[in-house]
Regions:
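Conserved GNAT acetyl-CoA-binding A-motif
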Residues: 85-99
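Short hydrophobic/aromatic beta-strand or adjacent loop that forms the aromatic wall/cage
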Residues: 34-36, 137-143
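Conserved catalytic-core motifs of GNAT/GCN5-like acyltransferases
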Residues: 94-96, 108, 113-134
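Conserved N-terminal entry element of GNAT/NAT acetyltransferase domains
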Residues: 1-9, 141, 145-149
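Acetyl-CoA-dependent GNAT
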Residues: 4-67, 79
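Conserved short alpha-helix immediately C-terminal to the canonical SAM/SAH-binding motif I
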Residues: 78, 102-103
Length: 149
């Protein structure tokens, strides 16, 4: 297993990124300015995009695992890698996600704690209703993890 930092042709990963953020114009807002990582084992399993939002504050914008490899620990391994990679140059690592029974417990198990929410984010920024785990997403829930030494 290896994790690669993808510098070029980031849009080649769009089909997988769309699993985690199903509106392409939203992905376009962060893909070019973010770092894209790909977990290979030996083929592509998981991708993650991380952006710098403030001085020493980074955010996981997208984390997606190919459907056949889900629930096998690849997402957790990617989050662990991201924490190691940004430790020392990042005080806080954020992740924004829908108020979903699938994603919030995942990030909490990875060590994130709920920080705040942005009301009506999915209503205001997406051109169609977004559902996850049978639940319509309305608010964006932010979780954070302290990474300062």
């Amino acid at each position: 297993m290896e994790i690669l930092n993808i510098q070029n042709h980031k849009r080649n990963y769009l089909p997988l990124l769309l699993l985690a953020d199903e509106q392409e114009d939203m992905i376009n807002r962060y893909l070019d300015r973010g770092e894209l990582f790909a977990l290979m084992d030996p083929e592509l399993k998981t991708v993650c995009v991380v952006t710098q939002e403030e001085n020493r504050v980074f955010e996981i914008k997208n984390l997606a695992t190919v459907p056949e490899a889900q629930n096998q620990g690849y997402g957790k391994r990617m989050v662990e890698f991201i924490c190691r990679h940004y430790r020392g140059r990042c005080d806080r690592l954020l992740v924004g996600t829908g108020d979903s029974p699938l994603t919030i417990p995942f990030y909490e198990k990875c060590g994130f704690q709920i920080s705040h929410r942005v009301p009506n984010f999915f209503l205001d920024h997406y051109d169609h209703p977004i559902f996850e785990g049978g639940k319509r997403l309305i608010d964006m829930v932010y979780l954070e993890m302290a990474l300062s030494d």
